[in-house]
Amino acid sequence: MGIARILSAVLFLSVLFVVTFPTLLSADHHDGRIDTCRLPSDRGRCKASFERWYFNGTTCTKFVYGGYGGNDNRFPTEKACTKRCAKA
């Protein structure tokens, strides 16, 4: 591998790091993953009717989950939602 290729690879990786690093430090991330508590409620794609809880930005709120799909802002109980999302 020539020196020009090595320098090009180093430059590319440096630019990639500079572009993505601020995103990793943003307020929407928690421990390296998107904070589930900021996601909107999502009923999912099926037509079942399961009582679930999501965090609406202030409190945990009940909603009807369809049973498949949706996102991670979905908890089986209000207590589980509050434990994960309520700020002390």
Curated annotation (Swiss-Prot):
GO BP, sorted A to Z: envenomation resulting in negative regulation of voltage-gated potassium channel activity in another organism
Signal peptide segment: 1-27
Localisation: Secreted
Disulfide bond sites: 37-85, 60-81
Function: Serine protease inhibitor that inhibits trypsin at a molar ratio of 1:1.
Transmembrane segments: none
Species annotation: Cyriopagopus hainanus
Molecular function terms from GO: potassium channel regulator activity; serine-type endopeptidase inhibitor activity; toxin activity
Name the record gives this protein: Kunitz-type U15-theraphotoxin-Hhn1l
Propeptide segment residues: 28-33
Tissues and organs where the protein is expressed, per its UniProt entry: Expressed by the venom gland.
Zinc-finger among keywords: no
Primary subcellular site in the record, as a coarse category: secreted
Family per similarity comment: Belongs to the venom Kunitz-type family. 01 (intermediate) subfamily.
Keywords noted in UniProt: Disulfide bond, Protease inhibitor, Secreted, Serine protease inhibitor, Signal
Domain BPTI/Kunitz inhibitor: 37-85
Site (Reactive bond for trypsin): 47-48
Family matches, as SUPFAM superfamilies: BPTI-like (SSF57362)
InterPro entries: Kunitz_BPTI (IPR002223), Kunitz_BPTI_sf (IPR036880)
One of the record's GO cellular component terms: extracellular region
